[in-house]
Amino acid sequence: MAQTLYDKLWNTHVVHTEDDGTALLYIDRQLLHEVTSPQAFEGLNVAHRPVWRISANLAVSDHNVPTTDRSHGIADPVSKLQVDTLDANCDAFGITQFKMNDLRQGIVHIIGPEQGATLPGMTIVCGDSHTSTHGAFGALAHGIGTSEVEHVLATQTLLQKKSKNMLVKVEGTLPRGCTAKDIVLAIIGKIGTAGGTGYAIEFGGSTIRALTMEGRMTVCNMAIEAGARAGMVAVDDTTIDYLKGRPFVPTGAEWDQAVEYWREFKSDEGAQFDRVVELNAAEIVPQVTWGTSPEMVTSIDARVPDPEREKDPVKREAMERALAYMALEPNTPMESINVDKIFIGSCTNARIEDIRAAAYVVKKLNRRIAPNVRLAMVVPGSGLVKAQAEREGLDKVFTDAGFEWREPGCSMCLAMNADRLEPGERCASTSNRNFEGRQGAGGRTHLVSPAMAAAAAIEGHFVDIRKLG
């Protein structure tokens, strides 16, 4: 019987299935960070349990770490406690960890693939919503809660119910100025934030196959924002080429065996999906969110939607509430919206490809950030990304234009460290969520691609980067 990619990943990891469909899944890799792991380790200590498979875990501090000068440590006592606790727990249990001043430190969903700890055919979990990122490698990856983090540490298994299969098929050549971020925002705009609820989404089609691994990770990263349990892309040469030579990846004869096995992780011809959604890449335009949900998104050449045109009273009320929070008037051209701050970073868009795309725009415009922009910051996704960008001189491109070049971490994506918006400030952000207060109490977030964020920094407002030539 023909199987989907999700079917194959699920079936190769089921240990036991109950009559009600609940399955015990074997977990190949658990990624840990400082926010959702302390209670899990405490549970192990209270029960006097060891970590079942130490080598299956990889830890890093990312949410609370400062992105400014780290020589003075962490100023906030709560953040310091969380980071110190992860350090102590990993030392006590013998878990591999990249500590704050390790060159390999970075955002958990960037360092996993970067190190080759994320591999095709794996089940991967982390106490973090955007674990779906790792599905770009033909893996089954999703976020879990803290009690489940403890369960995986203790047993290397997890209780789950199987999701339905969805295929999001994007065909055609992506227009100039459009990126993977625009693809996934367009998808969410089409199906909504509940469109993927109950599903595992496979992203396919010629447009997805043409993306780099960095682009595929961006798309899978935001599968959760469409309501899906997981997002994934089939294994191909692009996947294999990216992984070769990375630290955690098999070598020699084991590499050849692994590649042969990994290539099985694609949907079979004739495999049946419960839902299929199709998009024409040629119709995608650079995207900008206007509201307080990723589904509240439109094209840069459009206007802020008018709630009066929405027939559904529930949706109309949500639109009105969002516009009030965002301080936007209906029918305002998106290009006329001024911004106060710029954030280029996060597990969605802080890889070297993203940094290069933003730097290209800054260099092309050849001006400093606009006078109305109070802060423009670039936060690389890892120490290795930062070092690579500096070797290429990209840091100087940004600093010469008035941007701040920071240390790696989650930063302003969720404002758990000192990087945040003040009430009423408007930000062009390359992150993944634009909820109320996400980047700081009263902050107003617009989600865009790195190129769009860079252009907004220079111009002081959103611009259609297709016009830049």
From Swiss-Prot:
It comes from the Bacteria. Its cofactor is [4Fe-4S] cluster. It is an enzyme of class 4 (lyase). InterPro entries: 3-IsopropMal_deHydase_lsu (IPR004430), Acnase/IPM_dHydase_lsu_aba_1/3 (IPR015931), Acoase/IPM_deHydtase_lsu_aba (IPR001030), Aconitase_4Fe-4S_BS (IPR018136), Aconitase_4Fe-4S_dom (IPR036008), IPM_dehydratase_rel_enz (IPR050067), IPMI_cat (IPR033941). GO terms for biological process: L-leucine biosynthetic process. Its EC number is 4.2.1.33. Gene3D superfamilies: Aconitase, domain 3. The keyword Iron-sulfur applies. GO terms for molecular function: 3-isopropylmalate dehydratase activity; 4 iron, 4 sulfur cluster binding; metal ion binding. It catalyses: (2R,3S)-3-isopropylmalate = (2S)-2-isopropylmalate. [4Fe-4S] cluster binds at residues 347, 410, 413. Pathway: Amino-acid biosynthesis; L-leucine biosynthesis; L-leucine from 3-methyl-2-oxobutanoate: step 2/4. It holds the Pfam family Aconitase. Keywords: 4Fe-4S, Amino-acid biosynthesis, Branched-chain amino acid biosynthesis, Iron, Iron-sulfur, Leucine biosynthesis, Lyase, Metal-binding. Binds 1 [4Fe-4S] cluster per subunit. NCBIfam families: leuC, PRK05478.1, PRK12466.1. Belongs to the aconitase/IPM isomerase family. LeuC type 1 subfamily. Catalyzes the isomerization between 2-isopropylmalate and 3-isopropylmalate, via the formation of 2-isopropylmaleate. Heterodimer of LeuC and LeuD. This is 3-isopropylmalate dehydratase large subunit. It comes from Burkholderia vietnamiensis (strain G4 / LMG 22486) (Burkholderia cepacia (strain R1808)). The gene is leuC.
